[in-house]
UniProtKB/Swiss-Prot annotation:
This is Pigment-dispersing hormone type 2. Belongs to the arthropod PDH family. The gene is PDH2. Keywords: Amidation, Cleavage on pair of basic residues, Hormone, Neurotransmitter, Secreted, Signal. The keyword Ligase does not apply. The pigment-dispersing hormone causes the migration of the distal retinal pigment into the proximal end of the pigment chromatophore cells and thus decreases the amount of light entering the retinulas. May also function as a neurotransmitter and/or neuromodulator. The keyword Methyltransferase does not apply. The modification Alanine amide is found at A77. It holds the Pfam family Pigment_DH. It comes from Penaeus vannamei (Whiteleg shrimp).
Amino acid sequence: MARCFVVLAFLALAAMSLQVATAQDDLKYFEREVVAELAAQILRVAQGPSAFVAGPHKRNSELINSLLGIPKVMNDAGRR
């Protein structure tokens, strides 16, 4: 019962964040990454405890792209 409530709360949060995100239309790279990570977390919670056992798996290209994007994210954060 509590797990169902948590999943529904995450879905509501995701829906609200996507609604705000589509209103802005100019998401920055970091914001897109945060939304993608939130969606992945919601999917793992919805799939149950077996999804947490193996842990998240990233392909090499995803790891390289995320590492290459770090300086841009840090630079954007420094401008705020």
